[in-house]
């Protein structure tokens, strides 16, 4: 259950028809776009990274808890990860850890750019280069980037007022939890609109920083 102080935020959320339409689109993509084998419940707690002492590079990355794996839209896992960063940033802002919040949101861009670089590296291995050319690749990546905002919005809202709430927010003291929850909900609602104006990770970061800081309470 959400805090009584967030009741008005929930009512505004429920009355947001544009968000409802966007979630219908997200659910349709989820059910019909079998593009890749996905983790299905990806968040930072599902990833283990090993870095040798004295090195800045990881030599091993393991992802576990794959019981929800399925064939679905590529952007689903990407968006889920972005949402996790935003929620972690909301907690950090609520606790006054602004530098940590900025770092969390900076991971949105790092994650996307690493994904895009790896996908482009593997692109020469595609089955039919005559059909799927570089222009097709650019359009595909742009679509996935846009859809990542959509699935991030779905995940953010679900983690605040849905059945699978996040301890990042739930364990905050009520007086600061109120603003953190409000900020995440506002980011979710804004994301489904702002993705059409600018779907870059940098815009996601800037928008989240502004909304989360504006909403925080003390």
Language-model segments: what does each one mean?
Residues 96, 100, 126-147:
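Acidic, serine/threonine- and proline-rich low-complexity regulatory regions
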Residues 75-127, 152-169:
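Active-site activation/catalytic loop segments of kinase-like enzymes and analogous catalytic loops
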Residues 34, 39, 70, 74, ...:
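Secondary-structure capping and boundary motifs in well-ordered enzyme cores
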Residues 44-93:
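Catalytic activation segment of kinase domains across protein kinase-like and atypical kinase folds
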Residues 135-218:
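ATP/Mg2+ or Mg2+-diphosphate-binding catalytic cores
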Residues 1-39, 50-54:
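ATP-dependent phospho-/nucleotidyl transfer catalytic cores
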């Amino acid at each position: 259950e959400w805090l009584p102080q967030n009741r008005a935020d929930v009512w505004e959320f429920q009355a947001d028809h544009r968000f409802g339409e966007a979630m219908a689109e997200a659910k349709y993509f989820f059910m019909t776009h079998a593009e890749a084998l996905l983790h299905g419940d990806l968040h930072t707690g599902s990833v283990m990274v090993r870095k040798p002492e004295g090195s800045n590079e990881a030599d091993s990355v393991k992802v576990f808890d794959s019981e929800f794996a399925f064939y679905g839209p590529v952007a689903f896992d990407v968006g889920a990860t972005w949402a996790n960063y935003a929620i972690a940033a909301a907690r950090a802002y609520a606790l006054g850890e602004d530098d940590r919040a900025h770092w969390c949101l900076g991971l949105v861009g790092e994650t996307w750019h690493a994904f895009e670089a790896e996908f482009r590296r593997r692109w020469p291995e595609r089955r039919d280069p005559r059909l799927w050319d570089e222009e097709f690749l650019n359009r595909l990546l742009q679509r996935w980037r846009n859809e990542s905002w959509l699935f991030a919005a779905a995940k953010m809202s679900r983690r605040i007022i849905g059945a699978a709430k996040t301890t990042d927010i739930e364990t905050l003291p009520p007086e600061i939890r109120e603003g953190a929850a409000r900020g995440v909900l506002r980011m979710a609602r804004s994301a489904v609109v702002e993705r059409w104006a600018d779907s870059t990770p940098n815009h996601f970061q800037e928008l989240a920083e502004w909304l989360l800081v504006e909403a925080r309470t003390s």
